């Protein structure tokens, strides 16, 4: 899913590069939006540290039980407390690319970092092909993404049966402290999402466009309600396009370029959530990530969010991969499954709202109509 979605998005740039300044402004704003969102989320998790509400004895027991990745990570950290350039290079470009992605054995799952790099490289290489062949590659990648999305949907249909069992297992192993930790985690996530959407994005509107923030949020309220109720950026796209053209007065060329691309490449709420979950689960297991690792996490959360399918629960496979990348037991994802649906609805609102803000800002910066 990560490979197909990200590589396909890169291949599309071959068709969009002719739009020049529009594309450059859009991608710069996408990256800035998601980076700010992740940074805010990580600051919040480091400030409130919801995972620290769990007793230290419980953390030790969890590390012992899930051992493997967590224990190896703690050992590595004692030997290499700070991440250096060589470590970062090895994370992105291992000696055995296929082995790193697939996992060395049944006890070691693959890592997401080399996969992201390979997807970007393959997509960039495909851009150099002649249009007909490039289109064939893009169609193949899109088909792969659709197939993987179908598999994820099948797994998500089983979730209502699996989640109660996983929550029961978590409570038995961790105790009732987990509910306090989850409560602090949820409130922290919601607070940061509100802060980013209605404060950061309002500042963007005020400084970079001609729109009044209050009038803007009032005009797109139906779009945000649709996003919250469907938990899907893709399902909200038709409503967002209509609001952009009819209510916000955004040029059709700008709206038609920014919003569809934003449903897969401007996932601020998703990126924010990914960073928060990784730090929270790391705290639950008693694992401290260094500043260098958290900086790497910020970038990975941004790139990982780009690869997330715009469907309910689409970020869960990415989060599992991020946990593995930082040596945190992937089983820890079970801790947040019970509250994921509420936060999924909320982060979709942030994703869609930020898409419309970006389209508004890009349209204001463009000034003149972009030729078709």
Feature roles, as predicted:
Residues 53, 275-372:
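Transmembrane alpha-helical segments and their short flanking loops
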Residues 25-36, 183-200, 219-224, 295-308, ...:
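Small-residue-enriched core segments of transmembrane alpha-helices in multipass membrane transport
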Residues 9-18, 53-54, 130-135, 143, ...:
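Juxtamembrane helix-boundary/capping and inter-helix hinge elements in multi-pass membrane proteins
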Residues 222-305, 358-359, 371-372:
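Helix-loop-helix junctions within the multi-pass membrane cores of secondary transporters/permeases
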Residues 2, 159-162, 232-240, 254, ...:
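Transmembrane helix boundary and interhelical junction motifs in multipass membrane proteins
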Residues 108-114, 153-156, 191-192, 206-216, ...:
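Membrane-interfacial loop-to-helix junctions in multi-pass transporters
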Residues 18-25, 139-154, 215-226, 242-249, ...:
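Short amphipathic alpha-helical coupling elements at transmembrane boundaries
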Residues 25-35, 39, 43-55, 59, ...:
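Signature of multi-pass transmembrane helix bundles
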């Amino acid at each position: 899913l990560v490979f197909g979605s990200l590589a396909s998005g890169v291949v599309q740039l071959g068709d969009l590069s002719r739009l020049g300044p529009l594309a450059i402004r859009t991608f710069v704003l996408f990256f800035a939006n998601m980076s700010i969102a992740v940074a805010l989320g990580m600051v919040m998790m480091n400030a409130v540290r919801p995972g620290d509400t769990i007793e230290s004895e419980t953390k030790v027991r969890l590390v012992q039980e899930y051992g493997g990745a967590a224990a190896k990570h703690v050992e590595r950290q004692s030997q290499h407390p700070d991440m250096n350039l060589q470590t970062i290079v090895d994370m992105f470009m291992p000696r055995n690319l296929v082995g790193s992605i697939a996992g060395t054995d049944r006890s070691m799952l693959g890592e997401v970092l080399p996969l992201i790099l390979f997807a970007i490289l393959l997509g960039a290489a495909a851009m150099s092909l002649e249009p007909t062949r490039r289109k064939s590659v893009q169609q193949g990648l899109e088909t792969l993404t659709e197939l993987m999305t179908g598999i994820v949907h099948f797994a998500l249909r089983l979730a209502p049966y699996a989640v109660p069992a996983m929550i029961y297992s978590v409570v038995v192993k961790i105790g009732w402290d987990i509910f306090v930790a989850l409560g602090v985690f949820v409130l922290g996530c919601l607070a940061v999402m509100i802060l980013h959407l209605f404060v950061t994005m309002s500042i963007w509107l005020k400084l970079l466009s001609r729109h009044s923030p209050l009038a803007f949020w009032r005009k797109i309220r139906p779009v945000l309600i649709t996003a919250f109720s469907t938990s899907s950026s893709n399902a909200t796209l038709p409503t967002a396009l209509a609001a952009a053209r009819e209510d916000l007065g955004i040029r059709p060329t700008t709206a038609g370029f920014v919003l569809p691309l934003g449903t897969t490449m401007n996932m601020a709420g998703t990126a924010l959530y990914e960073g928060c979950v990784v730090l929270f689960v790391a705290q639950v297991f008693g694992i401290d990530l260094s500043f260098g690792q958290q900086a790497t996490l910020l970038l990975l959360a941004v790139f990982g969010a780009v690869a997330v399918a715009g469907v309910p629960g689409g970020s869960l496979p990415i989060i599992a991969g991020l946990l593995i990348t930082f040596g945190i037991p992937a089983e820890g994802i079970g801790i947040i499954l019970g509250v994921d649906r509420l936060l999924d609805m909320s982060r979709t609102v942030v994703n869609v709202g930020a898409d419309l803000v970006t389209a508004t800002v890009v349209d204001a910066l463009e000034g003149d109509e972009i030729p078709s």
